[in-house]
Each structure stands twice: as structure tokens, then as C-alpha cells.
């Protein structure tokens, strides 16, 4: 009999160990799947940011409209965040995250689809690509007393071309795809973190969040690498003979294979969604047992948390909840500390989002860097410095055991240092390019403060040139001309990228003495002084990014500690909504609108409508781009000072040292900063349990 009991106990012990292993493995599988979803999410976000200039050129749109497309991600997120935050924890969280990843991937693929329906990219009005012949039309030169063929185009052909170019309205699909990506990303962070908080071993949540923080950095690494690679590839690669393309990646009309990045990120997101559909709602229960006792489990959970609603009083509870919501909202909005910190955070985030959206365009236009080179350099700069800064910020707060006021001072100090380094960008603004008819007169002697936009001169007045054409050539006098015709060039030799033009009358009038009045395709390169400024800019960017990331880890910690504990979820949710609406959506739009004001030459399509900008006034561009960022950050620093004095008054003499719980929030803050302002929603599920504790509870119940 004793032997029989011993065998039963041994079997029960083995069964218990097997269940324990299965349950722990379920949680580990969730962590692995969530890690892949974080990589996919970060990859998609980086791909959109580095492709925004390519999209602007491909669809022939302004920077402000491109900014609206970029902000559509936040629009999609705002559409469902309330539903996800409230109902998400009550439903099957892994499956919701899986659906989100699936939508995220679908949105990325939808973004790339217009490429397959728009036809071949025409970088010039004279570019007519015939895949069967693998050739392009010849460039126009100065034809005295003759009329160029494009001036004699029949209205029927013009109207036909206009209809074809109306395909540029397919940017709407890019807008919708990015918005769908925003909808899909919404559940990943809040539901993922709450799931970890519910089912991780006691005290291990911070470790898991820190690991997600580190793993999430793989996404930007892959994104910048792919962005740099695809930016080198011509947009219609695989469809046209690349030897017939006469522009290079440094040309302002160059469009890389932007669509490939979205295809890759979309497929990666879809693949990352698959594991979530096979994970249980509760990893602490086997799948069959969970299905049988689902209703009992829900009732038990609600009893444990004192949240069971009386079904007969649902109407009263809804009214009470609505009233309580508005009372809570009033409470945080009448909290001076919260309002001040909300405003300064909004200003700083708006400055960051606006400047980061157009930093690639800035490097291209200001320093003459190709999109591929800009993506590669920014990736090398951003990833290690941001990771180092985030770690350093958390280490300093923990090492010196900073009080809440001390954390606010630390945040202000890092913001001030970053602000001062940002001021150093202004001396690094390069002079505007020497472009005849835009920044200087055709004789090359009279520079003008703003572009003159007078393409015709006596040296090309008899050439019958198309004034709207943008086919830049660089004269051997160092001046860029809008086209070979407007340079007065009479003849040419060579083909495609290697074409050289001769007998250029407008080059001659500048007083060049060598009698070799020639020009070659493309804009004149930047001088050595501007190149040196670029490397200084990169060095300052490294330091600036380091201090920004070091102080950026404090935002969520300060937010949750300046309001009542029961209001911190609402405080973070409301802050996220305001920042997404006024920062994530609006900042790229008004940054882009002001950048558009610095454009010197716009493209025009066959319909005669304005398209994308071909060249900017470098000086004005730099002042607007940097000045707007400074204009947003300076009042934020003033508000920081007010915030610190107000905190001293409120917390003077109180012990506000960082607790273990605050250090947990710091890990979550690092995660939040890495993922560009994603939402953090505190746990709304069951209480945290370890696998061991859950087994003990079950044994006690039996």
C-alpha cells in the first residue's frame, strides 16, 4: 500500500513538473515572439523616416504633404488607442498583438503597392523610357531660331501625359498604409508590457523590459542598413536598363528603391505575428484546462481584484465611471506640475520629431550627401549613442540615488547641454549653391540675398529653352545651370551620365580665360569648406544625441510621480494623446511647410501643377530647419526652470529617493523612449505570479 502511494506521489510530482515546464515555456515563447514584434515595429518606423524624401520625389509632392503622410501613423494609432487600452487586457492579449503585427505588415505592403501601378519614374520631362529599346531621349541643347519638340507637343499628347501623371495621387495609398501600420502597432507595447507585468516572476519584469529595450535596437540597425542599401538602387530596378539612367544618387531627382524597404518590413511583421496565435491567454494554465474553467477563472480573478460588476447595475456603473473619468481628468489638468511638464515635453518631442523627419533631407541639401550615405552615417551615429545615453541616464539616477527634484534637475541639465550643442549647428550652415538665374546672375559676379528666379539672360535668350526644365549641368567655371539649353550649350558628346556639353555661351560670359566653355551633367559639387563643416556637424550630432538620450529616460518617471498613484495611468495616456496629436501629427507638417518656403526651384508635371522641390536655398533652409527646432526647445527650458521651482516647493523636505518601483518604471521609460513615444498602459490583467508560486497555489487548492 505504501509503495502504491509512493508511486502515485511520484506520478503526481512528474505531472506537476511537466505542467510547470509547459507554463514557463509558454511565457518564454511570448517573450521571444514579442521581441521579434519589437524588431519589426522599429524596422517599419525607421524605414518610413528614411524613405520620406524618396516618397516626396516619387509622388512629386511638397514637404508639408510628405509630413502629413509621415504623421498618418499617429492618426491610425489615435483611432484605436482607447479601445486597446480599455478592452485589450480583457481579451486575448497575445492574439490581439498578433492581429496588430498582421495589420502592421499589411500596412507596410500597402504602402509599397503604388510602385507596381504607377508606371516608370520620369525624372525629367524629356525622359521617355522604353523598356524594349532600353533607351532614353536625348537632352536638349541651345537651338537658335528653332522650336524644340516639347514646345510643339499636341494638346492630346499633353492631356494623355497629364492623365498618366495623375497617378501621383496614389500617395493616398501610402497615407492609408502608414495609418494602417499605426493601427497595427497600437497593441504591441501596452498589451505586451502588461502581459509581462502580470505573468513574469516576481522582480523579473525589469529584467525582461531591459532585454526588450536592447533587442529593440536591432530594428533600427536593420532599418538603417537596408535604407542605405535600397537608396543606392534605382527605383525601377529590375524593370529598366540601368545603363540608360543618366542621374546619380547625389542628384536631387534620384529616387531609390523605397518600396523594397516596406516590402521587407511588411513581410517581417507578418511573420512575427504567427507565434502569437498559438499562445494561450494565460500562460499559467494549460490550454484545455483554461477552456473548461474559463468562466470560473474570470469570476475568480474579478473577485480577487474586487472588480466584479453587478450586471443589474451596469447602467449605474457606466454613469459612475464616466463621472469618475471626468473628475480624474479635471484632477490632473488642475495639477500645475503635470500641466507644466506636459507642455515642456510636448515642445521637446515636437522639436525632435520635426527635425528627425527631415534630417536626411537636410544632410542631402546642406552638405550634398546622397540619401544612402546620409542613412548609413545617421545609423552609425544614432544607434550606439542613443543606447549608451539611455543606459547612462538610468545608471546615474540609480548610482547617485537622485530624489525626484534631483531627477528633474538632471533632466534639465541634459536638455540644456543638448540645446547649447544644437546652437553650434548654425555656424556650420553652408553657402547656397552657385546657380545661375537663382542665386546669382549669369555673369557670375552679382550674388543675391534671395533667389532671383530669372532663368533667361542675353546669353541664352535666343535658344528657345523650356524655362521650367530641371536638367542641371555644371559649367567648368563652377556654376550650376538649370539645363544645357539655359547654359547656352550648342553641342555635346558622350552618352547618359558621361555626356559633356560644349560651346556654352553662358559659361563664356563669366570671363573664363581657357576658351573651354563646357559643362557636364549634374550639379556642381560642394567645396572643401562645406565638406569639412559636414564632418564637424556629424561630431556634434554624436554628442547631442548622447545628452538627449541620457535625459530622455526621465520623462515617464517624472510623469507618474507628480500625480496621485491612482491617476498615473490616465496621466500617461493623456500625455501620450496630446504628444501624438500635436507632436507626432502636426510637427512634420509645419516643419515641412516652412521648409517648402525655402525652395528655389519646383518641378512641374505635364499638367503644369507644382511637384516636388528640386533645389533649396541652403542658407534659408538651414536657418528655418535649425531655427524652428531651437524655437521649440528654448521655451521648454524656461518651463523646466519653473517646473523645478514648483517641485521644490511641493516636495521640499520629503523623501523622494528612487524606489524599486521607480527603477522598474525607469526600465519602462527606456522602452518608451526607444519606441518613439509609444503608449504604456499599466497592468489591467491578473496579478503577477511566478511559475513556482502558481504551482504552489494550485497544489494548495487541491
Curated annotation (Swiss-Prot):
- Where in this protein does the record say Phosphoserine is found? 293, 295, 683
Give a brief account of the tissues where this protein occurs: Highly expressed in liver, in particular at the basolateral membrane of hepatocytes near the central vein. Expressed in the placenta. In testis, primarily localized to the basal membrane of Sertoli cells and weakly expressed in Leydig cells and within the tubules.
Q: Name one GO biological process term.
A: monoatomic ion transport
Q: Does the keyword Transferase apply?
A: no
Q: Which Gene Ontology MF annotations are present?
A: bile acid transmembrane transporter activity; organic anion transmembrane transporter activity; serine-type endopeptidase inhibitor activity; sodium-independent organic anion transmembrane transporter activity
Task: Tell me the membrane topology, using the record's own terms.
Answer: Multi-pass membrane protein
> Which residues are the signal sequence here?
none
Q: Where's the Kazal-like domain?
A: 453-508
The glycosylation sites are 134, 145, 151, 445, 503, 516
SUPFAM superfamilies tied to this protein: Kazal-type serine protease inhibitors (SSF100895), MFS general substrate transporter (SSF103473)
Residue stretches spanning the membrane:
29-48, 68-88, 95-119, 169-197, 217-237, 256-280, 332-353, 374-397, 402-425, 538-560, 570-595, 630-647
pH dependency: Optimum pH is 6.5 with estrone 3-sulfate, taurocholate and L-thyroxine (T4) as substrates.
> Which residue ranges does the entry give as Cytoplasmic-facing topology?
1-28, 89-94, 198-216, 281-331, 398-401, 561-569, 648-695
Task: Reply yes or no: does the keyword Transmembrane helix apply.
Answer: yes
Query: So which disease is it linked with?
Result: Hyperbilirubinemia, Rotor type: An autosomal recessive form of primary conjugated hyperbilirubinemia. Affected individuals develop mild jaundice not associated with hemolysis shortly after birth or in childhood. They have delayed plasma clearance of the unconjugated anionic dye bromsulphthalein and prominent urinary excretion of coproporphyrin I. Hepatic pigmentation is normal.
- Protein name according to UniProt: Solute carrier organic anion transporter family member 1B3
Amino acid at each position: 500500500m505504501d509503495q502504491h502511494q509512493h508511486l502515485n506521489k511520484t506520478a503526481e510530482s512528474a505531472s506537476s513538473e511537466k505542467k510547470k515546464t509547459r507554463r514557463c515555456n509558454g511565457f518564454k515563447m511570448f517573450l521571444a515572439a514579442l521581441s521579434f514584434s519589437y524588431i519589426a515595429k522599429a524596422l517599419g518606423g525607421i524605414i518610413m523616416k528614411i524613405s520620406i524624401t524618396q516618397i516626396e520625389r516619387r509622388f512629386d509632392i511638397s514637404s508639408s504633404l510628405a509630413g502629413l503622410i509621415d504623421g498618418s501613423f499617429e492618426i491610425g494609432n489615435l483611432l484605436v488607442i482607447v479601445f486597446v487600452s480599455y478592452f485589450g487586457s480583457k481579451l486575448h492579449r497575445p492574439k490581439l498583438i498578433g492581429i496588430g503585427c498582421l495589420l502592421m505588415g499589411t500596412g507596410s505592403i500597402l504602402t509599397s503597392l503604388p510602385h507596381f501601378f504607377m508606371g516608370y519614374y520620369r525624372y525629367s520631362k524629356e525622359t521617355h523610357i522604353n523598356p524594349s529599346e532600353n533607351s532614353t531621349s536625348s537632352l536638349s541643347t541651345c537651338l537658335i531660331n528653332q522650336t524644340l519638340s516639347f514646345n510643339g507637343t499636341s494638346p492630346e499628347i499633353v492631356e494623355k501625359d497629364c492623365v498618366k501623371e495623375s497617378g501621383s495621387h496614389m500617395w493616398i495609398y501610402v497615407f492609408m498604409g502608414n495609418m494602417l501600420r499605426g493601427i497595427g502597432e497600437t497593441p504591441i507595447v501596452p498589451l505586451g508590457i502588461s502581459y509581462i507585468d502580470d505573468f513574469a516572476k516576481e522582480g523579473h519584469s525589469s529584467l525582461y523590459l531591459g532585454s526588450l529595450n536592447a533587442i529593440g535596437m536591432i530594428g533600427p540597425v536593420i532599418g538603417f542598413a537596408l535604407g542605405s542599401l535600397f537608396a543606392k538602387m534605382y527605383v525601377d530596378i529590375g524593370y529598366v536598363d540601368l545603363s540608360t539612367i543618366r542621374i546619380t544618387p547625389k542628384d536631387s531627382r534620384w529616387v531609390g528603391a523605397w518600396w523594397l524597404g516596406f516590402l521587407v518590413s511588411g513581410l517581417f511583421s507578418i511573420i512575427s505575428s504567427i507565434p502569437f496565435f498559438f499562445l494561450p491567454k494565460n500562460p499559467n494554465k494549460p490550454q484545455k484546462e483554461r477552456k473548461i474553467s474559463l468562466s470560473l477563472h474570470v469570476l475568480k480573478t474579478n473577485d480577487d481584484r474586487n472588480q466584479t460588476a453587478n450586471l443589474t447595475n451596469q447602467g449605474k456603473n457606466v454613469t459612475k465611471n464616466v463621472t469618475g473619468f471626468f473628475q480624474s481628468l479635471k484632477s490632473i489638468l488642475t495639477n500645475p506640475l503635470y500641466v507644466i511638464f506636459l507642455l515642456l515635453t510636448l515642445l521637446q518631442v515636437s522639436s525632435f520629431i520635426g527635425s528627425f523627419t527631415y534630417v536626411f533631407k537636410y544632410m542631402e541639401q546642406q552638405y550634398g550627401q546622397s540619401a544612402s550615405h546620409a542613412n548609413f552615417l545617421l545609423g552609425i551615429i544614432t544607434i550606439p549613442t542613443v543606447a549608451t545615453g539611455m543606459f547612462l541616464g538610468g545608471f546615474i539616477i540609480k548610482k547617485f540615488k537622485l530624489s525626484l527634484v534631483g531627477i528633474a534637475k538632471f533632466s534639465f541639465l541634459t536638455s540644456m547641454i543638448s540645446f547649447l550643442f544644437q546652437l553650434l549647428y548654425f555656424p556650420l550652415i553652408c553657402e547656397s549653391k552657385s546657380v545661375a538665374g537663382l542665386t546669382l546672375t549669369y555673369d557670375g559676379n552679382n550674388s543675391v540675398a534671395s533667389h532671383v528666379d530669372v532663368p533667361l539672360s542675353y546669353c541664352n535668350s535666343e535658344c528657345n529653352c523650356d524655362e521650367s526644365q530641371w536638367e542641371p549641368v555644371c559649367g567648368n567655371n563652377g556654376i550650376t545651370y538649370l539645363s544645357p539649353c539655359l547654359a547656352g550649350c550648342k553641342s555635346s558628346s558622350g552618352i547618359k551620365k558621361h555626356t559633356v556639353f560644349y560651346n556654352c555661351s553662358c559659361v563664356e560670359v563669366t570671363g573664363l580665360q581657357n576658351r573651354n566653355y563646357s559643362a557636364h551633367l549634374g550639379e556642381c559639387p560642394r567645396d572643401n569648406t562645406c565638406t569639412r563643416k559636414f564632418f564637424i556637424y556629424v561630431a556634434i550630432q554624436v554628442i547631442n544625441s548622447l545628452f538627449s538620450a541620457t535625459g530622455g529616460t526621465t520623462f515617464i518617471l517624472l510623469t507618474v510621480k507628480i500625480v496621485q498613484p491612482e491617476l498615473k495611468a490616465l496621466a500617461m495616456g493623456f500625455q501620450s494623446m496630446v504628444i501624438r496629436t500635436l507632436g507626432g501629427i502636426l510637427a512634420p507638417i509645419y516643419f515641412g511647410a516652412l521648409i517648402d518656403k525655402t525652395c528655389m526651384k519646383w518641378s512641374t508635371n505635364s499638367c503644369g501643377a507644382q511637384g516636388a522641390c528640386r533645389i533649396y536655398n541652403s542658407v534659408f533652409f538651414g536657418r528655418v530647419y535649425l531655427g524652428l527646432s531651437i524655437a521649440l526647445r528654448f521655451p521648454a527650458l524656461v518651463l523646466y526652470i519653473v517646473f523645478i521651482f514648483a517641485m521644490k516647493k511641493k516636495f521640499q523636505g520629503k523623501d523622494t529617493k528612487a524606489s524599486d518601483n521607480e527603477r522598474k518604471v525607469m526600465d519602462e521609460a527606456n522602452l518608451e523612449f526607444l519606441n518613439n513615444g509609444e503608449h504604456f498602459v499599466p497592468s489591467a490583467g491578473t496579478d503577477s505570479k511566478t511559475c513556482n508560486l502558481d504551482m504552489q497555489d494550485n497544489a494548495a487548492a487541491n
